[in-house]
């Protein structure tokens, strides 16, 4: 149940983009993402220029997401609307065939997780990313998920490259197979209520 396609898409909305935790996506979430991304990129330092750039990116992203997913045009994208948009625009497709808004989502997420900026998401960064969304009694739970997610080649390379991350993210939101390795992209999942 936790790795079902339905739950994975709910998870993306709830834990990745509904920053203000009101149960839906709206313009405010993307304004908050601009602040968050600026601070993450600056490793805690706030650059007005970087913020202005992130504001522009996030405003454009919200406008594109609203165009793709706000079917009733009320200024809010519900979980159901987001699921419909994913089904319509992403399901069964590779990353390269996704709409621009989804690609920006994915690139920004990679940038936020790649804390050391080496172009790879290693086990240490994966652990840090996982604990920002869920509680774990043992680190082994996270490590086991990382090992299910990654291949031997990924681990030899020092982690997931951007290209590999893009492919896994595309599978996470578009592949209905509950046993695909991409199900572990954001760690051990819980059922989203």
UniProtKB/Swiss-Prot annotation:
Cross-referenced Pfam families: EF-hand_5, EF-hand_7
Q: How does it assemble?
A: SCPs from crayfish, lobster, and shrimp are polymorphic dimers; three isotypes (alpha-alpha, alpha-beta, and beta-beta) have been identified.
List the source organism: Penaeus vannamei
Tissue specificity comment: Expressed in tail muscle (at protein level).
The UniProt record gives the binding positions of Ca(2+) 3 as 114, 116, 118, 120, 125
Coiled-coil region list:
none
Please tell me what else the database record remarks about this protein.
The sarcoplasmic calcium-binding proteins are abundant in the muscle of arthropods, mollusks, annelids, and protochordates.
| Role summary | Like parvalbumins, SCPs seem to be more abundant in fast contracting muscles, but no functional relationship can be established from this distribution.
A GO molecular-function descriptor: calcium ion binding
Q: What does the record give as the organism's lineage?
A: Eukaryota, Metazoa, Ecdysozoa, Arthropoda, Crustacea
Q: Where is region (IgE-binding epitope) located?
A: 10-36, 49-72, 130-147
Protein name per UniProt:
Sarcoplasmic calcium-binding protein, alpha chain
Where Ca(2+) 2 binds, per the record, is at 70, 72, 74, 76, 81
Q: Which UniProt keywords apply?
A: Allergen, Calcium, Metal-binding, Muscle protein, Repeat
Annotated residues for binding of Ca(2+) 1: 18, 20, 22, 29
The record ties this protein, via InterPro entries, to:
EF-hand-dom_pair, EF_Hand_1_Ca_BS, EF_hand_dom
Q: Which residues form the EF-hand domain?
A: 16-40, 57-92, 101-136
Which SMART domains does UniProt cross-reference here? EFh
């Amino acid at each position: 149940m936790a790795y079902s396609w339905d739950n994975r898409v709910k998870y993306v909305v709830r834990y990745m983009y509904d920053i203000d935790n009101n149960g839906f996506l709206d313009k405010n979430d993307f304004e908050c993402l601009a602040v968050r991304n600026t601070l993450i990129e600056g490793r805690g330092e706030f650059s007005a220029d970087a913020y202005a750039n992130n504001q522009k990116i996030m405003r454009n992203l919200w406008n594109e997401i609203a165009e793709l997913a706000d079917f009733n045009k009320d200024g809010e994208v519900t979980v159901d609307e987001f699921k419909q948009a994913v089904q319509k625009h992403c399901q069964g497709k590779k990353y390269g065939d996704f709409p621009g808004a989804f690609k920006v989502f994915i690139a920004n997420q990679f940038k936020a997780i790649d804390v050391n900026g080496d172009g790879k998401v290693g086990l240490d960064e994966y652990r840090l990313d996982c604990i920002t969304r869920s509680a774990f009694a043992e680190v082994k739970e996270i490590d086991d998920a990382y090992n299910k997610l990654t291949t031997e080649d990924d681990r030899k390379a020092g982690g997931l490259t951007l290209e590999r991350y893009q492919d896994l993210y595309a599978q996470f939101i578009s592949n209905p197979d509950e046993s695909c390795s991409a199900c572990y992209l954001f760690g051990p999942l819980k059922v989203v209520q």
